[in-house]
Amino acid sequence: MERDRRLDLGDTHPAVDPTERRLLAYALAVGAASVPSAHGAIVYSGVQNLTLTRTAGSDASLNIDLDGGATDFVLKWYDSTGIIQISSESQNIVVNDGSGLRRLSAGALIGPGSPSSTDVKELANYGVSGTWTSGTWTAGATGYAGVALGSSGSSSTPWGWIQITLPASGTVGSQVVVNSWAYESTGGTSINAGAVPGPGALVSLALGAVGLRARRSRAA
């Protein structure tokens, strides 16, 4: 039977009064809801669920900005062909699989040794009818795109991932979803697809807030 890992303030922190327990719970809730968040060297976007919708008679695009600056990548859906592609901006790169964007599973290593390119890469082709016909990403698939914010040959380049979900059908009105992303703020450092900040920093922050309040109460 799995051990209950919830934080029981009544048992582990007997000196914390009800007001302080409420403060700790509030601090944890605020910390967990903060977007983006950072712990260690990983910077995480939080859940985004940005959408790219196929539009009849015109091409649709979605700008993706990983670090709060300029656009880093552009996801496009061409209605005339049904092709979904990603392009890199400002010499940023994507992890490729030949002419396509490689779909990575959770835990896959992304870093300086990854095959990468600044070229436009295709994810999938749904054709004019909206039926998936080809691509490195299959219909209805969720996966991770490996990316880098800069040249693959630079030791200062941050590596990261973008989680993307493709629709089961590619008819007009269907949507591609960019679920979330993260990157290593330390240049040249590899990251695992799907890696996010751990909760330890949030717990420490909350406990610190409780301790500060307790010290102030005793001093009053």
Descriptions of predicted regions:
Residues Y26-A27, G57:
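Short amphipathic alpha-helical surface micro-motifs
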Residues A41-A195:
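A domain-level signal for the mature, folded cores of soluble proteins
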Residues M1-P18:
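N-terminal secretory signal peptides that target proteins for export/translocation
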Residues D11, A27-L28, A219:
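A periodicity- and composition-biased signal for non-globular, repetitive helical segments
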